[in-house]
């Protein structure tokens, strides 16, 4: 999916900066990798990633696809052959690490961009229901038996609180 490719670009950009910091690649190599990764993050070159997320092993195919695309486009950007898919773009990395890391980045982004806003909407809807049902008394239940009466709005506030504090 597009979001996985985006996450791989974020990861490869971060790795390039770390590899520059530790003198594993040159500044010119880092600049070329970062430029291509930022373009991929902006949605460019997605047609260069034909693989499906379902694949054998540890995601080696997607990792190598990313390395090769970044290397090819980075060399075009630098106007010279300074990047190699394994030796520079994939420096200090392993498919066993990059694929799970990219998945974690993708999931974290999806949680922040999609799940949390939906939970905020749910919380607001429950607050409205609490206000609309204020004063309505219902029988509490515990151990499949009747318990102390409570306001329906209190029960709703318990559900809301669980969502807010989870």
Where are these regions (language model features)?
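Conserved, well-structured ligand/cofactor-binding cores
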Residues: 1-166
